[in-house]
Amino acid sequence: MKNKLPPFIEIYRALIATPSISATEEALDQSNADLITLLADWFKDLGFNVEVQPVPGTRNKFNMLASIGQGAGGLLLAGHTDTVPFDDGRWTRDPFTLTEHDGKLYGLGTADMKGFFAFILDTLRDVDVTKLKKPLYILATADEETSMAGARYFAETTALRPDCAIIGEPTSLQPVRAHKGHISNAIRIQGQSGHSSDPARGVNAIELMHDAIGHILQLRDNLKERYHYEAFTVPYPTLNLGHIHGGDASNRICACCELHMDIRPLPSMTLNELNGLLNDALAPVSERWPGRLTVDELHPPIPGYECPPNHQLVEVVEKLLGAKTEVVNYCTEAPFIQTLCPTLVLGPGSINQAHQPDEYLETRFIKPTRELIIQVIHHFCWH
């Protein structure tokens, strides 16, 4: 029953107080089971049917899908339950205690993005869900901050095909219809060690990597010249060399060298296309030194994402907000949800607060966010 639902600020407080950190380092990684249980119970109190699914390949992580209403289509409101780790020495407040000060709500996940679920739950108090003409779905995912395993698994396994979806990432309530993707790779060169006094008796992995880097930088120039999307502040794919390590002593021929790099592709580019371009760029090194160069993924790749600017969802949301959609350089779960239905990224709070010490959401977002959620439910579920 709706009267069992706690007040807005208490919902928010409980979500922030329930740790759900995602991290690649096992010691820091946490299950989101307790948070999913909180959300599931509250949506059940509102009359929703709730399904909780374990996400394969994770450390006890779960997705939750709450649904109400009958028929095809409808609206999906989606978000992730996890947060990044925090640096205790840089926070001046308890990350797991919601505190309000000077028009700001502080806490880990206030903006990115536990708060979105508090807004949805609180708004639904004022919605007569028994009168919906189309279904309303609420999706809470796992591990967005690391592998995006929750969104990937949901998109691969669900039969749902809503009319549209909104992902409530912090966009300062400015609708986002496109973003770049992200690919990160480790380039490894296996040489042959030996004493530096006789270089011919070894294969110097650093020298081979020097050759490989030249070809990678040529690929970077080719990407910049060949691909453009003027709406982005950086209107071409970027390629960054982020980390390199090789060798162990000045008097030893380097036996191994490893380079970490990333590419941020435009929405029009496929992951297979990018992998092909990278392999082609490195082919001269591989052919000259067979078996000594390998390319491995550091993280599961994320494709670029775009909702067409003339799509009905874009037009409706732009009209409701009185604001044009934007494109951004950071990544979200949108590429995976977009495989099910047209998707926008739109939510309260600023992306500038995400992953920051003393993360906060400004209270000025409370009223317009509630109004927006009511408006999109009315438009997509009652018409």
UniProtKB/Swiss-Prot annotation:
Subunit record text: Homodimer.
Cofactor note: Binds 2 Zn(2+) or Co(2+) ions per subunit.
Cellular location(s): Cytoplasm
Role description: Catalyzes the hydrolysis of the amide bond of N(2)-acetylated L-amino acids. Cleaves the acetyl group from N-acetyl-L-ornithine to form L-ornithine, an intermediate in L-arginine biosynthesis pathway, and a branchpoint in the synthesis of polyamines.
Binding site for Zn(2+) 1: H80, D112, E169
UniProt keyword list: Amino-acid biosynthesis, Arginine biosynthesis, Cobalt, Cytoplasm, Hydrolase, Metal-binding, Zinc
Gene: argE
E.C. number(s) listed in UniProt: 3.5.1.16
Pathway: Amino-acid biosynthesis; L-arginine biosynthesis; L-ornithine from N(2)-acetyl-L-ornithine (linear): step 1/1
Active site (record annotation): D82, E144
Known cofactor(s): Zn(2+); Co(2+); glutathione
One GO cellular component term: cytoplasm
GO biological process annotation, one example: L-arginine biosynthetic process
SUPFAM superfamilies cross-referenced by the UniProt entry: Bacterial exopeptidase dimerisation domain, Zn-dependent exopeptidases
Pfam families cross-referenced by the UniProt entry: M20_dimer, Peptidase_M20
Entry-linked InterPro entries: AcOrn-deacetyl, ArgE/DapE_CS, Bact_exopeptidase_dim_dom, Peptidase_M20, Peptidase_M20_dimer, Peptidase_M20A
Name under which the protein is recorded: Acetylornithine deacetylase
GO molecular function: acetylornithine deacetylase activity; zinc ion binding
